[in-house]
Amino acid sequence: MVNAADLLAAAVRDGRLERSSGVSPHEHPLAARSYLSDGTGLAWHVPSALRSHGTFVLDAEIPRPVRSTLVRRYGVDDPDTFAERWTRAEALAKLADLPIITWLSRHGLTVPEHVGALRDVGETDWSTERFGDVIVTFAVTAHAQRADTSEERSPAVGGTV
């Protein structure tokens, strides 16, 4: 089995992150994608040599003032800290194949101790970084073993992996 931390490091290092107004599945069929509040989006082009070893997702947000209802619910009022935690929760929910509302009701903005055990997907790792005005969480679940490599996998964008 490939180590998730090594996979993630290689994908972030060797992949390409593209911000544009068009990040649809039609325009970027093999990229992990996330849409931003300003109408643009990010497409993360993971090198093809890595894609067969894991499921790669990302989530991104432009930090904004945190609504008072969210401050009360999650106890975070700093926009950057909230965006970091939110994108991490979104990315991990995508890997767990859960709608974000389900993730939030179960875990809030925290990471469960055994996040890789959320479903039978394998070892999981993530990294949250800032790119200009955007906070991005990259995440991967390493595939334990892949018997059939004849079909190309399309990474998740929404709540489905």
Predicted regions and their residues:
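Core catalytic alpha/beta fold that binds nucleotide/phospho-ligands
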Residues: 1-161
